[in-house]
Amino acid sequence: MNPTRHAQHCDDLTEALAAFRSSCSVLHRWGGELAGRLGGGARLLVAGNGGSAAQAQHLTAELVGRYREDRPPFSALALHADTSSTTAIANDYGVQEVFARQTCAHGRPGDVLMLLSTSGASANLLSAAAEARRIGMTVWALTGPAPNPLEAACDEALCVAAPASATVQELHLVAVHMLCEAFDQVCEERASVSRRPSPSPSPVAVERGAL
């Protein structure tokens, strides 16, 4: 056995994580914007294939449930999780339409569609991105190395510079958690403001109002 070879996975992750740190500001901004939109009644739609589908569902679970501290639930849907709709659409319209048709059904102007793909080239995600932009949704993506077609099809993309799909997916999970942390931070800040008592009018103001 070669210990160095078995540690290569960790070495690849460490190297990619160092480059990934520059993405922190993007995730913080996304989390804040998402908190504002979902807090105002918008919803998040998320989609991915294979391992990326699992990551997508992880994100929606954190938002509908909770990430760390208790807070109200927010509307977030993982499109692949509705297996009956997904298989029916694939059977009747083709696999390329499984996410686009659901985006058309559930998406509204002002909503956010987040797409996860290690390759950045999945046809069904590209179709969903086009449909979302037609509707007036904002489209974000987590992908593998740039450039890639999905990056070009979205409003904004965070592209992980790592050659292995496994490493990309691992950093996508980091991105999901950082996004949720920023989301919760903004939610807590807004809740703190709403809990503050309204300032009492000064005696002078009360007296002037009585005159």
Question: Which role fits each region the language model picked out?
Answer:
Residues 6, 27-30, 56:
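Hydrophobic packing residues in well-ordered alpha-helices of helical domains and bundles
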Residues 199-201:
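Compositionally biased, low-complexity intrinsically disordered regions
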Residues 207-208:
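A cross-taxon signal for low-complexity, glycine/charged-rich
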